[in-house]
Amino acid sequence: MTDNNQNNENHENSSENSKDHHEARAGAFERFTNRKKRFRENAQKNAESSNHETLSHHKKEHRPNKKPNNHHKPKHASQKTRNYAKEELDNNKVEGVTEILHVNERGTLGFHKELKKGVEANNKIQVEHLNPHYKMNLNSKASVKITPLGGLGEIGGNMMVIETPKSAIVIDAGMSFPKEGLFGVDILIPDFSYLHQIKDKIAGIIITHAHEDHIGATPYLFKELQFPLYGTPLSLGLIGSKFDEHGLKKYRSYFKIVEKRCPISVGEFIIEWIHITHSIIDSSALAIQTKAGTIIHTGDFKIDHTPVDNLPTDLYRLAHYGEKGVMLLLSDSTNSHKSGTTPSESTIAPAFDTLFKEAQGRVIMSTFSSNIHRVHQAIQYGIKYNRKIAVIGRSMEKNLDIARELGYIHLPYQSFIEANEVAKYPDNEVLIVTTGSQGETMSALYRMATDEHRHISIKPNDLVIISAKAIPGNEASVSAVLNFLIKKEAKVAYQEFDNIHVSGHAAQEEQKLMLRLIKPKFFLPVHGEYNHVARHKQTAIACGVPEKNIYLMEDGDQVEVGPAFIKKVGTIKSGKSYVDNQSNLSIDTSIVQQREEVASAGVFAATIFVNKNKQALLESSQFSSLGLVGFKDEKHLIKEIQGGLEVLLKSSNAEILNNPKKLEDHTRNFIRKALFKKFRKYPAIICHAHSF
């Protein structure tokens, strides 16, 4: 073949290749156009089908507020939706999917430009997802006022008022323990003065769960004021038992049993109880809808994914409200200093199994009487290792009976024995479940340890499991019980066994999850001392809540919240009332002050008889002291006081001597000054004066 022929053939082949190439490109473009057309048509059909199904579904559900999804074909700019950051339909975009147009460009400029639009769209989606507050009506003048009466600046005693100008609800009514030195005071309850002021607009008391620090004050409140009381069955069951003890059975007529996931109207509020995990059965968070916006109150909580009853926190409902837009979150701060997550209640089981398996004698397990899951687990392992179960302690027996009767737990009755039957069984066949984990002097465990219990004393071979942590303020009491148990040579499993107790409160990672689910505009950390709520504030800031949208409250503070603002508007009288738990009676503040005075400075008592004419003490006058000096020195002290009074009477005028009240005050003032000069303290003075 010649060179010319070769060139001609190459030219012909090149022309044919070029023609084939152009035909291939035309075919590819046609196929691309047809594919895009089919894509749009299918997407439109799917959207129409989805609209039809959605509309039919909403008709069945009777939810008129839900509008059919017609976003694929907006008729007017006002109909554009923010759903999935979709502002408009481009030629190459169908329902959140964009096709690439710059397929054959030489570089990547157009391709990257299209990708960048996708990045911007997804960023917009994320921003709106994290901040759904645009759904709130910022022009609304409605607001709510939050007033904590207990539970802030302290551990326990939780009580809070949420109110509008015309309506109010009270969330929880709990008790707390007194500090050392409040002699004869067993529990503290919130001051109800503010409730008396607003009683005409209180629509109800809302209970989150049945722990004592949330329900312990209810009988004392109902002795003064009565309102509808809303709660889940266990909460109302335990409150009802308290009412029986206080002679308030008739007030059960105020009880309202609620169902979770079912919003109800209470005054001007719409409230939904949302299942939450905690260290007691049937705990709830609250979704409170108001004209100003939605409020979420977590109650006490942790996020337990493997709870004993297999009923985890209802994260869906929390997220549901978060997507709708939440104005205010009030969240549990108790464990705000604890990093990570709180272990599941179910992690206790292996430790119990090991301890019960290895125990040679009796097993005595003490925990909070309200921690029914903990008690239930202990009893199950007692049964597993063929032990008879003795439940000892009034509150423990009561709570367990109520939980069984209501169907929360199921246990064979034949496994249980009474306290007076324990001695009939070998030690390795007995489990005693009892109260006293906080070292209470009247508890069953304390009385066993001090040989004061009628039927049971601690033996050297006993294994005592204290499955609880000391509440702040109770450390000394718990230590005292531990000392008694160890002196009895019992084996004690307490804090060195980290896996026999877990907290019921959320640690930092769970608090973060709650904040991310709810995405509140404003945040009020609750439940804890000031250092706890301050640490919770830092966690909230890390989760995107602006610092200016967070306020740290104390008991008595009044904070007003609206869609566009949060501010402190005042302070009301708050404080504590004292209760003698043995008599179930309140103790006047003045009595507590007198007891403190006597404890710190002692008492001096004087009953004097005066001869007015001689201006002298009669021999029948009597003096005594307590807590000032020892018995040996008391006579010398009394002689000093008598001598001083003789001098005082000689210089007293007739007006004082003839008026018993003035004579008594005159004598008291002299004794008070004399004792202060001698001891540099003011003892309590008991003085009676008579003149003849």
UniProtKB/Swiss-Prot annotation:
How the protein assembles, per its UniProt entry?
Answer: Homodimer. Homotetramer; dimer of homodimers. Interacts with RNA helicase RhpA, might be a member of a minimal RNA degradosome complex.
Domain of life of the organism in this record? Bacteria
Q: Which residues form a coiled coil?
A: none
GO term, biological process aspect, one: protein homotetramerization
Record note on modification: Acetylated on nine lysine residues. Some of the residues are acetylated by multiple different mechanisms. RimL is partially responsible for the acetylation of Lys-324, Lys-398 and Lys-650. HPB8_1270 homolog is partially responsible for the acetylation of Lys-324, Lys-398, Lys-512 and Lys-650. Acetyl-phosphate-mediated non-enzymatic acetylation pathway takes part in the acetylation of Lys-135, Lys-324, Lys-398, Lys-512 and Lys-650. Acetylation of the remaining residues Lys-141, Lys-338, Lys-548 and Lys-635 occurs by a yet undetermined mechanism.
Identify one Pfam family in the record.
Lactamase_B
Q: Gene name?
A: rnj
The residues that hold substrate are 501-505
- Cofactor(s) listed: Zn(2+)
* EC numbers, comma separated: 3.1.-.-
Q: Know the name of this protein?
A: Ribonuclease J
Record's subcellular location: Cytoplasm
Q: InterPro entries given for it?
A: Metallo-B-lactamas (IPR001279), RibonucZ/Hydroxyglut_hydro (IPR036866), RMMBL (IPR011108), RNase_J (IPR004613), RNase_J_2 (IPR042173), RNase_J_b_CASP (IPR055132), RNase_J_bac (IPR030854), RNase_J_C (IPR041636)
How its function is modulated: the record gives: Catalytic activity is regulated by the balance between homodimers and homotetramers, with homotetramers being the active forms of this enzyme. Acetylation allosterically regulates the homooligomerization state and hence the catalytic activity.
Which residues are involved in binding Zn(2+) 2? 213-214, 300, 527
Query: What are the leading ranks of the lineage?
Result: Bacteria, Pseudomonadati, Campylobacterota, Epsilonproteobacteria, Campylobacterales
Cofactor binding summary note: Binds up to 2 Zn(2+) ions per subunit. It is not clear if Zn(2+) or Mg(2+) is physiologically important.
Q: Which residues bind Zn(2+) 1?
A: 209, 211, 278, 300
Any one GO MF term held by the record is: zinc ion binding
* Record's compositionally biased regions (Basic and acidic residues): 9-25
